Amino acid sequence: MTIVTAIQIYTYSREREEKQMSKKFELTTESIMYFGRTLFRIKALVGFGNVETGELGGYIEKEENLDQSGNAWVSGNACVFGNACVFGNAWVSGNAWVSGDACVFGDACVFDDACVSGNARVSGDACVFGDACVFGDARVSGNARVSGDARVSGDARVSGNACVYGNACVYGDARVSKSTHLFQVGCIGSRHGFTTFYRTKNKRIHVACGCFSGDIDEFEKKVIKNHAGTKHEKTYRAAIELAKAQIEDVEGGE
C-alpha cells in the first residue's frame, strides 16, 4: 500500500464517520409494504428533542422524507413516502401518513389516522388529527386544527385559530382563518347529510352539500327547486340564514 493510498483510505474513513455522526437517524432493515411501496423503520442515532438515542420511529421510504436536522420526527406506525418531507420541529405519529409532494414543517403535528397528501402543506403550530385529510394544494397553518372526518383540499387555506372538524368539507378557494369563517350543520335534508358553509377568498359564502358545491345564493335556488313545500326546504333555508348570520368578513355580512 502506497502512502497516497493510505491517505485516501484514511480520508474516506474520516469523511464517512463524520457524515454518519452528523445524521440523527438511519433506516433499519425492518420494512413494510404500504400502498405498493417499501418503507423502512427509522432509528435515532442521537438524542434530540423528546427522542432518545436508539429509539425506533415510524416508517419512511427514503432519507429525504425526514430532515436530518432539527427535531422533526416520525413515530409510532406513521408513514412518510413519495416525495413528502417532514422537517423543522414537526411530528408525524400514530397511524398518520404523509405522501405525494406534501410537506409538514414548523411545529406542526399530524397524528391519529390523519393523512396529508398531494401538494398540501401543514405548518406553524397547526395540527391535523382524527381521520382528517388535507390534500390537493391546501395549506393549513398558524394554530389551525383539522380533525374528525374533515376534508381540506383544493386551494383552501385554513389558518389562524380556525378549527375545521366533524364532517366538514372545505375546498376550492376557501379562506378560513377563524372559527366564524365556517359553519356546519347536520344531519339534515333527505339524505340526512352534513352541509358546510365557509368563506372564500372573494369574501363570499361557499356551500358544500353532498354533490352540490357552489355559492350560497345558488344553493338557496337549488333548495327551492328540489325541496319546495317540504320540511327539507324549511331546514335548509334556516341553515342558510344561520350561516349568513354566523360567517364573518363576507360581502353583505354584519
Positions of predicted regions on the chain:
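Short, Lys/Arg-enriched N-terminal segments with co-localized hydrophobic residues
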Residues: 1-20
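Intrinsic-disorder/low-complexity loop/linker signature
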Residues: 7, 36-37, 202, 211
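Extended, small-residue-rich solenoid/repeat segments and analogous flexible loops
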Residues: 14-85, 89-91, 95, 252-253
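A structural signal for alpha-helix termini and helix-coil/disorder junctions
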Residues: 48, 225, 229, 249-253
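Thr-biased low-complexity repeat/linker tracts and other Thr-enriched repetitive architectures
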Residues: 71-175
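Mature, structured domains enriched in cysteine- and short glycine motifs
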Residues: 75, 200-202, 209-210, 244-251
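Glycine-rich hexapeptide-repeat left-handed beta-helix
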Residues: 116, 127, 133-134, 139, ...
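Charged phosphate-binding loop/patch that engages nucleotide di/tri-phosphates or the phosphate backbone
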Residues: 232-254
